[in-house]
Amino acid sequence: CERIGMESSMITHEANGHKATTPAIFPTHTEAFAEVVKKMTTGEGKCINDVSEIDAIGHRVVHGGEKFKESCLITDEVIETIRELSPLAPLHNPAGILGIEAARKVFGNIPMVAVFDTAFHSTMPPKAYMYAIPYEYYEKYGVRRYGFHGTSHKYVAHKAAEYLEEPIERLKLIT
């Protein structure tokens, strides 16, 4: 689902060789997930009989700050920490939390994982992530270079290694 809460919202569903994009108004994330369940369990795009067949759900979270250096299972504490990090991604993290909370309502106890876009870049050394500004801005506000779109960079890097038939550890790539 895209553009949840806007009149231009839509759902794209692909399964069994059938792909469809349908305009639909989703005022809330919960309503959007309910439509996702409907698409997955009925019609030409049916791919499961019931949500109990889903093993896990992944959520892309834009900013994990310095708290999250890898993906993790979502707990109430993880959601609260993502909420605390919202000033670092005020347009994305709050919307991501809405999606996580709605998914919890719709999908119940299915395990959910947060995949942080900033995690890929978490191994940068301080000389690469510190800005030439007063150090107290980093200490008080967490102002530093984080790196974004890490999930995409990781995917492209691993695909390049696969294509080149080289271990990723031996490659120096620009993605």
PLM region descriptions:
Residues K46-H92, F120-M130:
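Short beta-strand-loop/turn "lid" adjacent to the catalytic site in phosphate-handling enzymes
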Residues S8-I11, T81, A89, K140:
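A broad, structure-centric signal for solvent-exposed, well-ordered loop/edge residues
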